[in-house]
A protein has these predicted regions:
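N-terminal lobe of the biotin/lipoate ligase/transferase fold
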Residues: 1-122, 143, 195, 292-295
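Short, ordered beta-strand-loop transition motifs
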Residues: 7-9, 132, 254
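Short loop/edge segments at beta-strand edges and connector loops
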Residues: 44, 131-133
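Long, positively charged amphipathic alpha-helical accessory segments at protein N-termini or as interdomain linkers
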Residues: 101-107, 111-129, 139-295
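Conserved active-site carboxylates
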Residues: 136
């Protein structure tokens, strides 16, 4: 797809419209990120950008390699769910990272990605967003973005991490399947204005690069503090579905590895490393945690 150009007699030419298709040269900031964008792989169609990034990482792709696709035929969500990925309307991207950290700290990079997405939405588009643990970015309670991180590691070190990000930018109502598990939206549906996908990608990669540099230099605490400022769980009673059953309690923050903490009526907070928040309600007063299922 080419650029639309008008010829003006005795003057020259002017650009009327740029193509909607993404261009690998236009998705990175003018000031190249320090770590992200060492390689950019732009695909017209793929099954999953995470699968592509994983393959590249195993083949030795350098840290900061980016995969970005116009559409996915099998976009991946958490727990085997499918990320709906129509062509030419959203952002589907995965990034290869090789942080010198133990596996226990890897969840912090999922939180970092959520913070970067929320910042772009608010600061570039003027929309208040929030983050739902562990990986959803919401607008007015509806999911607008998700993050899926996958890791190759040994007991004491990470070989590489693939951070996949999907952001609903220009989807219309009819593009969403009717049987979605959770309500979803797009920036277009919220604002009524079409989003420049390349511009969104440039801003996101720049913010991801800065946050990643902060994480490597200062550890996870700045990431955790930023995530808590964006989270939608403050003063909420949560019900969380885990592999061992359901746990409920008052949101008590995150630990230093990004695990969810639920207050337990005076005892040490319950620590949840993986699960889905399936219910949330305002809590005027403390209630004890109830646990269903094994430990």
């Amino acid at each position: 797809m080419g650029y639309a150009i008008d010829g003006i007699p005795s003057t020259g030419y002017r650009l009327v419209a740029a193509p909607d298709a993404l261009d690998a040269d236009e998705v990175l900031p003018d000031t190249r990120p320090e770590r992200l964008g060492t390689r950019v792989h732009l695909l017209a169609e793929t099954r999953s950008t995470n699968d592509d990034a994983w393959r590249l990482a195993r083949e030795g792709a350098p840290e900061g390699s980016i995969v970005i696709a116009e559409c996915q035929t099998g976009g991946k969500g958490r727990k085997g769910r499918v990320w709906v990925s129509p062509k030419g309307v959203n952002l589907y991207t995965s990034i290869v990272l090789r942080p010198p950290i133990p596996p226990s700290q890897a969840p912090l990079l999922t939180l970092l990605a959520g913070v970067a997405v929320a910042e772009v939405i608010r600061e570039d588009h003027g929309i208040e967003a929030g983050i739902k643990w562990p990986n959803d970015v919401l607008i007015d309670g509806k999911k607008v973005a998700g993050i899926l991180s996958e890791m190759s590691a040994e007991a004491d070190r990470v070989h590489f991490l693939v951070v996949g990000i999907g952001v609903n930018l220009n989807m219309t109502e009819e593009m969403f399947p009717p049987d979605l598990l959770h309500p979803a939206t797009s920036l277009f549906l919220v604002t009524g204005t079409k989003v420049d996908r390349a511009s969104f990608a440039r801003s996101l990669y720049g913010r991801l690069d800065r946050w990643y540099a902060t994480f490597l230099a200062r550890g996870g605490e700045p990431v955790r503090e930023a995530w808590l400022a964006w989270c939608v769980h403050r003063d909420r009673w949560l019900e969380v579905l885990t592999l061992s059953g359901r746990q409920s309690g008052r949101f008590a923050g995150l630990d230093d590895e990004g695990c969810l903490l639920l207050e337990s009526g005076g005892a040490a907070p319950a620590r949840i490393s993986a699960g889905d928040v399936v219910r949330s309600r305002q809590m005027p007063s403390a209630e004890p945690v109830s646990n269903e299922g094994g430990g």
